[in-house]
């Protein structure tokens, strides 16, 4: 998979779930069906129980393969009580599995660090080295 795995210093401005074309225009996406409430724009997803399904990976235990990040590919209102960037179960979603995409996190990263998800919790973290312990993915 040719997915961005390191933090870039000169990333263009953008919002979570937006594909970044700051370095090149190559990217690859595929469609899937959300199967839980943890599938949201700009978040990592893992394979669901059935072919063509995905479930959230951010903030929960990772039990299957990480497939990519959910793309913001349609208008989602930011007004009113229905303003959510979370997809409901059964919604169609687009997943980026190659290229650069914006994610939004509380953690601070520096240029060149690697992006990891902790398998037990789904927490996103940044490290200077690729994890070899098997406790993290990506």
Regions found by a protein language model. Give the residues of each.
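Surface-exposed, low-hydrophobicity beta-strand/loop segments enriched in small/polar/acidic residues
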Residues: 1-138
């Amino acid at each position: 998979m040719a997915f961005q795995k390191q933090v870039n210093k000169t990333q263009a401005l953008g919002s979570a779930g937006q594909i970044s074309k700051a370095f090149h225009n190559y990217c690859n996406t595929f469609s899937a069906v959300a199967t839980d409430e943890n599938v949201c724009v700009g978040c990592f997803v893992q394979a669901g129980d059935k072919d063509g399904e995905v479930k959230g990976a951010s903030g929960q235990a990772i039990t299957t393969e990480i497939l990519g990040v959910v793309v913001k590919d349609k208008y989602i209102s930011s007004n009113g009580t229905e303003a959510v960037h979370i997809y409901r179960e059964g919604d169609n979603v687009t997943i980026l599995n190659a290229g650069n995409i914006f994610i939004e996190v509380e953690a601070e990263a520096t240029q060149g660090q690697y992006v990891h998800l902790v398998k037990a919790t789904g927490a996103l973290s940044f490290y200077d080295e690729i994890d070899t312990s098997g406790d993290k993915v990506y």
